[in-house]
């Protein structure tokens, strides 16, 4: 049976790490066949104490704790790959937790797809968004639509070859032989860039919606605004590095439409209609009243991510410094 390494960066995660690790300890996959590598960025809360207590409580031996001296997640990811003993490694987050069949479904998916696609380097699934307050609920609403420019792992219903995977499981040997690591210029969006780099080098990725994890969305307006601007900046930096995806341009299109209003109102009409149609679709699907506000929320979201995009495009990696 395949051995799997799970790489989890942490920094002041005492609120979320218990749910994360307990779900990892209770996988329907043999405990002796996976390890958990924690890379802690010098937490100042009780994160490390909680981890050690959980390890003792569950009698889980295959857990190792490292200090992430540079603190940022991107460095933890690269160190995790170097220290991974598994046939596969998984990049995960302490702000999330996997379903009980997460490991089993990853392995089964990889083995099945690998038979038809020998260049398969990794697989991933979808994310359920958990909202703890109204700010987090607003973030959930925004990411529920493709018009946010977000990745399909938020809403995919069927399996498909994708250009990125969330909390992906990768073939350790293929990645190490390719010498592809996470680009440390990216403090945000580093996983997206890593996946695009794999695609650029001819590898394949696959998303299976049966591989499920849950993620706590940003719990404050300030954190969400900062994250959104950072995501935009990351995409601007990706274009500077030679990557491109047409979906990235949708959030920024409204800026050009505002400039074109004197010439024609057609583009603005298309923009508004696209948002209204998707608002109606989501209202019918979810029956949640908050989706009525989606047009306004998307407009504000597009403003923020556009600002970040042009900041990243102009300033490059200095945006994150």
From Swiss-Prot:
Compartment(s) of residence: Cell membrane
TM annotation in the entry: 252-272, 290-310
Molecular function in Gene Ontology: hexosyltransferase activity
Topology of this chain in the membrane: Multi-pass membrane protein
Keywords for this protein: Cell membrane, Glycosyltransferase, Membrane, Transferase, Transmembrane, Transmembrane helix
E.C. numbers: 2.4.1.335
Superkingdom: Archaea
Catalysed reaction, written as an equation: an archaeal dolichyl N-acetyl-alpha-D-glucosaminyl phosphate + UDP-2,3-diacetamido-2,3-dideoxy-alpha-D-glucuronate = an archaeal dolichyl 3-O-(2,3-diacetamido-2,3-dideoxy- beta-D-glucuronosyl)-N-acetyl- alpha-D-glucosaminyl phosphate + UDP + H(+)
One Pfam entry name: Glycos_transf_2
Pathway the protein takes part in: Cell surface structure biogenesis; S-layer biogenesis; Protein modification; protein glycosylation
GO cellular component, one term: plasma membrane
Disruption phenotype: Cells lacking this gene result in flagellins and S-layer proteins with significantly reduced apparent molecular masses, loss of flagellar assembly and absence of glycan attachment.
GO biological process: N-glycan processing; protein glycosylation; S-layer organization
InterPro entries (UniProt xref): Glyco_trans_2-like (IPR001173), Nucleotide-diphossugar_trans (IPR029044)
Family indicated by similarity: Belongs to the glycosyltransferase 2 family.
Stated role: Involved in the assembly of an N-linked disaccharide that decorates the S-layer glycoprotein and flagellins. AglC catalyzes the transfer of 2,3-diacetamido-2,3-dideoxy-alpha-D-glucuronic acid (Glc-2,3-diNAcA) from uridine 5'-diphospho 2,3-diacetamido-2,3-dideoxy-alpha-D-glucuronic acid (UDP-Glc-2,3-diNAcA) to the AglK product Dol-P-GlcNAc to yield Dol-P-GlcNAc-Glc-2,3-diNAcA. AglC is specific for the monophosphate-linked Dol-P-GlcNAc.
Protein name: Dolichyl N-acetyl-alpha-D-glucosaminyl phosphate 3-beta-D-2,3-diacetamido-2,3-dideoxy-beta-D-glucuronosyltransferase
Gene this protein is translated from: aglC
